């Protein structure tokens, strides 16, 4: 009995100690992850409480998309800024499910080896590269498209540029110059 109790206490102690080391090693994973919505959910929320919409266009096979999920989108600064200033949408650009957006139904198009979703093609102006990010204003009008993998230090300036409404009066390069 004593040996079993000692083993149990030892095992529980190891679990607590190892979980404590995770924080000591500087694990910067956010405790407030990004709240992802479907496009339909984001539009419905936007009607009740207007906010800009951030759309992450991804595919299941995209390695850089997965890397952004594991690094950039788990960064606390990025996650908090996105949650506070945008309704965030994760949109699989090859999903088979029809989507109604602004009164129009968008469908999957079986083309080539994988196909694509018409909404992704429409929002990305036919430039289907992944990851790509689409920013919409409160009227669901596209502000800009931002293609490619981005580290937290690369995406934060563009999030602040769009989220803060600076795109209405400044070009991005002017905004960056003022921020430095």
Where in the sequence are the language-model features?
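A short beta-strand-turn-helix
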Residues: 34-53, 82
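Short, internal strand/loop/helix patches
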Residues: 105-127
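Typically the conserved alpha-helix immediately C-terminal to a functionally engaged Cys/Sec
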Residues: 66-83
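Thiol-/selenol-based redox modules, centered on thioredoxin-like
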Residues: 142-180
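A short, hydrophobic beta-strand/beta-hairpin element that forms part of a small beta-sheet core
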Residues: 122, 129-146
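Bacterial Sec-dependent N-terminal signal peptides
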Residues: 1-27
């Amino acid at each position: 009995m004593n040996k079993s109790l000692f083993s149990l206490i030892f095992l529980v102690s190891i679990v607590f100690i190892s979980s404590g080391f995770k924080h000591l090693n500087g694990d910067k994973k956010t405790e407030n992850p990004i709240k992802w919505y479907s496009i339909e959910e984001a539009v419905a929320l936007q009607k009740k409480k207007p906010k800009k919409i951030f759309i992450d266009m991804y595919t299941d096979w995209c390695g850089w998309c997965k890397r952004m999920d594991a690094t950039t989108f788990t960064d606390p600064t990025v996650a908090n800024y996105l949650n506070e200033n945008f309704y965030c949408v994760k949109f699989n650009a090859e999903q088979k499910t029809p989507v109604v957006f602004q009164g129009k139904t968008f469908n999957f198009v079986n083309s080539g080896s994988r196909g694509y979703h018409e909404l992704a093609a429409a929002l990305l102006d036919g430039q289907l590269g992944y990851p790509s990010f689409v920013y919409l204003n409160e009227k669901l009008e596209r502000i800009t498209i931002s293609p490619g993998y981005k580290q937290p230090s690369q995406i934060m300036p563009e999030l602040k540029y769009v989220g803060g409404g600076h795109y209405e009066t400044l070009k991005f390069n002017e905004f960056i110059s003022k921020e430095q």
